[in-house]
Amino acid sequence: MFTLGIICWLFDRTLDLIEKRIAKVFTGKKEALAAPNILALNAGYNFADTIEAFSSRYTVSKVNLPPGEYRRITGNEATALGFLTASQLSKLPLFYASYPITPASDILHELSKLRHFGVKTVQAEDEISAIGMAIGAAYGGSLGLTGTSGPGVALKAEAIGLAVMAELPVVIANVQRGGPSTGLPTKTEQSDLLQVVYGRNGECPVIVVAPATPGECFDMAIEAFRLAIKYMTPVFFLSDGYLANGSEPWRIPDPDKLPTFEVTFPTGENGFIQPYSRDAETQARPWIIPGKAGLEHQIGGLEKENITGKVSYDQENHELMTRLRVDKVAGAVQSIPDMSVHGDEKGDLLVLGWGGTLGAIRHAVDNARSKGFSVSCAHLRYLNPFPGNLGDVLTNFEQVLVPELNLGQLLMMIRAKYLVGAIGLNKVQGQPFRTSEVENKIYEMLDKPVRKVAGA
């Protein structure tokens, strides 16, 4: 408390709110502890005020946030709450299996505290067991979920292909870290993008979503399950170590305003349903859980015959089914929102990012715009498929800059798909971007004589 008092003086903060908090925490049998803690807090404040050892004080202006009830939340905490909320909204039990791995382990820790909501968690003996359990849970009608980091994704790859072939709604949370191999377990990176989009044998498409802030982890965790169920396909939730361990003030949502998503299982009461028949809108197959009389069907990793789901080695059927799976994932674009542009919708330069780079990018763009530069930014939350308007957004700007904590993986994808001459700003040091790094690159690309920015 003494140290906290010093910090409050340094940052020009009054003590009244902290004193009220202390009084609230130390109630009942602990009430006697409140007074000495408040005294220690004030002693630290007065010590800093009188010792004349500090040459500077700092004033942090009050943040401008919408009204509501807020709490501090980390990315992994928000991720766990988001997956729990998806369970509540869908009225399906959540099953989470994972092998401990930094920086994803906190998701297991948080979900294991939520058993009173019906959450089931398993600390598996290895990565392959964890994804196998999640697939089995999805097959049985639960929300099947597993979590890991890049090395674990490599081990899970074959089983993820099984989920694609069986067309089951499994969600895989990948909290990225520095790689390859063991790499930098406690440092952040964005080097798993190509791995999660393409890293399996065969034509093996999956949906990929990525939060941009710790608080957004909550929303995108729900979105991952919404898309997985709607399209009956595996979905990657792609976070990173910076988001996982970073925190921010998070407005607690009103549960009554969260959109529900209905889940129905065929019962066989209306006759036999072909296991690989397709929904006209989404091309998803029905979610048939085992134990329903009359709905028995084959399941597994061998190619399935269209409609019937029987094992098939027919060459034309294989191409048909391959294209159906690819088109189904590509068609998910109709269920994701268009991306928005921060700033003008046309101009000299667009800074395009994804994941935890949002803060540095937006601050850099705002700084440049305040100096009169024609620059805007956009941030991707959907990485496969891309938002439907991404191509139009890119062509509205003379130049495109793509900052990434890798050696240009999103850059490669948008160059290939949209044929734009984008430029990368790449960093693989285990650290997030500084605002100054992005800002100086903006001035360099706009070829303007601006003094180089230093600092954060």
Predicted regions and their residues:
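A non-catalytic, amphipathic alpha-helix used as a structural packing/dimerization or gating element
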Residues: 21-24, 36-39, 43, 219, ...
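Short alpha-helices
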Residues: 1-26, 408-409, 433
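Short glycine-rich anion-binding loops that position phosphate/pyrophosphate groups of nucleotides
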Residues: 4-7, 151-152, 176-178, 356-357, ...
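Short helix/loop capping segments that flank catalytic or ligand/cofactor-binding pockets
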Residues: 105-107, 156, 181-182, 219, ...
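Short glycine-rich or small-residue beta-strand-to-loop segments that form or flank ligand, phosphate
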Residues: 3-5, 94-97, 144-147, 207-210, ...
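Flexible, low-complexity linker and terminal segments
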Residues: 73-82, 90, 220, 225-456
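Thiamine diphosphate
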Residues: 17-206, 210-211, 428, 436-439, ...
